[in-house]
């Protein structure tokens, strides 16, 4: 029996990776059995630039709720936000991230955060890897024919992979 962060499964754990944003929220759902990764679904929640911000948050919330209902993840992994310049953008992305975390919290689904360095280290084996290296390794690890598009979906899958690897050593 596999036990990951308190979730006992005979065969697998389902992880929802989220790449937060307010224009695009990347998501990736994968199953992990302790050895193998099986990509279930990935994509992006898109919002229109000319839509009022509160309506964008509402749209993100509704679409993420649908993802939770459809795929029933056991855990959510999200990349920790890091911004060095535009505070307005950082605040807006943080609010969109909060909407996604709320969907997990409503279901008592644990949420784990990973820094970009942790994601790169987990997926590529090198914490200073370039974005294209992370995307290519994500494709290879998951056995996909092509790099997931949009990039936000690949980032979300990388966060889910990171969680599966970290949870092996913390459970």
Predicted segment positions?
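Phosphate- and other anionic-substrate recognition elements at nucleic-acid/protein interfaces
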Residues: 1-171
């Amino acid at each position: 029996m596999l036990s990951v962060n308190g979730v006992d499964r005979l065969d697998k754990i389902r992880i929802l990776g989220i790449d937060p944003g307010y224009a695009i929220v990347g998501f990736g759902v994968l199953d992990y059995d302790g050895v193998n990764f099986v990509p279930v679904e990935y994509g992006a929640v898109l919002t229109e630039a000319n839509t009022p911000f509160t309506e964008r948050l509402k749209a993100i919330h509704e679409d993420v709720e649908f993802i939770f209902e459809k795929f029933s993840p056991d855990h959510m992994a999200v990349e920790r936000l890091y911004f060095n310049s535009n505070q307005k953008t950082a605040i807006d992305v943080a609010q969109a991230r909060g909407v996604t975390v709320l969907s997990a919290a409503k279901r008592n689904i644990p949420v784990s955060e990973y820094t970009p360095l942790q994601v790169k280290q987990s997926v590529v084996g090198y914490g200073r890897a370039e974005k294209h290296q992370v995307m290519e390794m994500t494709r290879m690890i998951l056995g996909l024919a092509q790099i997931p598009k949009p990039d936000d979906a690949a980032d979300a899958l990388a966060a889910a992979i990171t969680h599966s690897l970290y949870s092996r050593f913390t459970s």
